[in-house]
Amino acid sequence: VILYGRYKAKINHRLIHNAKKQGKLILVTAISPTPAGEGKTTTSVGLADAMNALGKKTMLCLREPSLGPVFGIKRGAAGGGYAQVGPMNDRQLRFIVDGLGGKVNGTPREDGFDITVASEVMAIFCLATSISDLKERLSRIVCAYTYDGKPVTAGQIGAAGAMTALLKDALDPNLVQTLENNPAIIHGGPFANIAHGCNSVLATKLSLSLADYTITEAGFGADLGAEKFLDIKCRYAGIAPSACVLVATVRALKSHGGVAKADLSQPNLEAVKAGAANLIRHIDNLKNGFGLPVVVAINAFPTDTPEEQAYVEQVCAEQGVPCVLSEVFAKGGEGGKALAEKVLEVMEDRPIQYVYPLEMPLKQKVEAIAKKSTVPTV
C-alpha cells in the first residue's frame, strides 16, 4: 500500500498477478435512469457497509465520480451563493483552432479537449490488465489519417511510450474508505453512453483477490451499463457476478409512468403501475436474458407511500424475484442489512448468457443489443 495522506492510498496493481483467491462478485445496476436519480452508488456503498456489519469480508469497487455532470446541472452539490463554477465551465476548450501563424509556424487545424471520463484513453485504461497491455492498447489509438485515407496510430508516431509513462502511477488502484470505515477501491470511470461505463479491470480483479465479496456497479440502466459490464468487461476479464442487485425507486417508476419531475413527490399509484413495465423488462433482461440471480432493491424515499412500495413488491413477486426495501441513504449500513441478507441468500455461480458471440459481425451485434437488451422509455 502506498499512502497519500491519512485517508487514502494506492495499491500496487501487480499484486493481482500473484493472487490465488477469487471472491464473489455482486453487480449493482438499475432500471432506466431518470432525472430523479435511482441510487446505484448509494445502494452499492450501503450494501458494502451492511455486509461488513454482518461479518462478511466485503470490498466496494466503484468508478471515480466525474465533476462534469455535477457542474453541468447548474452547480448541483457545488455550494450556494454566487456561482463560481457553473458559468465558468470552459466549454470553449472543446473547440480549438490552432496553427494560425502561417506556413512557418504550423498548419491550421481544429482540435479540442475531452473531459477525462469521455476520453478514449480512459476506456482503454480501464480494460488494461498490466502496464505492457496498456502500452499495447494505447499504441493502437488512431490519431490521424494520411492523405490517402490510411489510419495513423499513436504507436506509429512514437507516442505510446510517453503516454504509458504518464499513466504508470494512475494504473495503481485508489484505496479509500466509506463513512463506516470499510474499504473501497475507486479507480477509473469511462462514461457508459460512449464507452463501457465500468471501473477498471485491475481494480475489480484486485478486490476479488483480497475480499470474500466485491460489490461493483455499472453506469446508467441495466440495458446499457449492465449489458456492457457483462458482454465486454466480464467476458474480457474472465469474471462473472454471482448476484445482481437491480435498484428501483417509486419516483422513477412514476417518471416512467408519465409523471413530470415536479410532481414525483405526490402519491400516484396509477403512475407506478404504468411505469412498472420498465422494471419488468429489466428484470427479464437480467434474469432470463443473462441468466443471473436478481434481487430488486427499492431505494426508499420519504415521499413513498406503503401502497406504492407494496405494489412494486407485488410486481417483483409475479416475476419470481425477491424485492427488498433499502434504507441505506437514511440509515447507512443498518438500513441495508435486509438487502445484504437476501443477496447472500440468492447468490449462485452461473455462466453468463451473453447477448452476442464475439465472432458475430458488428452490425449484427448492434442489432442483437437493440432487440434483446435495450429498454424503451417514455
Identify the residue ranges that each predicted region occupies:
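Flexible phosphate-sensing "switch/lid" loops adjacent to ATP/NTP-binding sites
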Residues: I2-V378
